[in-house]
Amino acid sequence: MPGPAAGSRARVYAEVNSLRSREYWDYEAHVPSWGNQDDYQLVRKLGRGKYSEVFEAINITNNERVVVKILKPVKKKKIKREVKILENLRGGTNIINLIDTVKDPVSKTPALVFEYINNTDFKQLYQILTDFDIRFYMYELLKALDYCHSMGIMHRDVKPHNVMIDHQQKKLRLIDWGLAEFYHPAQEYNVRVASRYFKGPELLVDYQMYDYSLDMWSLGCMLASMIFRKEPFFHGQDNYDQLVRIAKVLGTDELYGYLKKYHIELDPHFNDILGQHSRKRWENFIHSENRHLVSPEVLDLLDKLLRYDHQQRLTAKEAMEHPYFYPVVKEQSQPSSENAVLSSGLTTAR
């Protein structure tokens, strides 16, 4: 009879929540204050998810454009968790800003009110991004991830749909904190999180003692899809096939090494479908259409993110220090860069 899986803990920010008061992370005890939804007039439907419907709206008290996320009937505990996390992260770098929590006066349905972002659909946007754009937006996303991780929170659903980009204003926001959770060392978490193409190997092999590094895998998948112009990069037909797609790139021997290290027993179904695959070189994915987006630096970064072993993946802070981002850091350290954008807008207006 195989023993239990080996333990694991985050390499960074592991004790953040134990150093805070219980009130910070005990979301079940949180009592959100619900305002009146009548202050907001719904303008148009922006989309719908598994747990909500999202609308563009106007705050009639100040004419401000906002986004209203009307929550579908779901466990109170889940709503409390999302609200508590959004309140804890309020004001964080590139984190979507929660403006209000309201309820419909009649139906009593809860809704979350957020800042409005003039988002471009990623399927169109990713086709026009330059090499520098990709570096820039990935760096901005890393700021959001380092911030939430430093606050003891894993997002657990990083994917293009949850990264709003206003390309004209070069503004990025990480949205949809409905699956986010507080990190406590040695806690075993639900593996039914994240979206299939962005699920880390730990989820696919049912390893529950995961941590912030799960988000770094998802970010790696996004980066790969952007630089190789292959959306999604790992295109599994189901959760089993998803691991097969990953193994065809990262290799099966490497997968077995990971399983051995953490004493993970693989679902027997994998015996029939995994096969044997060698590790592929990242250069294999370069072709004429994506060559202008690929550099030795980005392949090195990608290689350090897309690792089976979650403990080996770069942390958000480590990733931000990677040479791939030097051009972005250089631009952001020049105080004139923002003024230049402003003045270029002004010169035409004069």
From Swiss-Prot:
Source organism superkingdom: Eukaryota
GO BP field: DNA damage response; double-strand break repair; negative regulation of proteasomal ubiquitin-dependent protein catabolic process; regulation of chromosome separation; spermatogenesis; Wnt signaling pathway
Catalytic activity, as annotated: L-seryl-[protein] + ATP = O-phospho-L-seryl-[protein] + ADP + H(+); L-threonyl-[protein] + ATP = O-phospho-L-threonyl-[protein] + ADP + H(+)
EC number: 2.7.11.1
Pfam family, one: Pkinase
MF annotations from Gene Ontology: ATP binding; protein serine kinase activity; protein serine/threonine kinase activity
The protein's role, per its UniProt record: Casein kinases are operationally defined by their preferential utilization of acidic proteins such as caseins as substrates. The alpha and alpha' chains contain the catalytic site. Participates in Wnt signaling.
Subunit structure: Tetramer composed of an alpha chain, an alpha' and two beta chains.
Membership in a protein family: Belongs to the protein kinase superfamily. Ser/Thr protein kinase family. CK2 subfamily.
Protein name: Casein kinase II subunit alpha'
Protein source organism: Gallus gallus (Chicken)
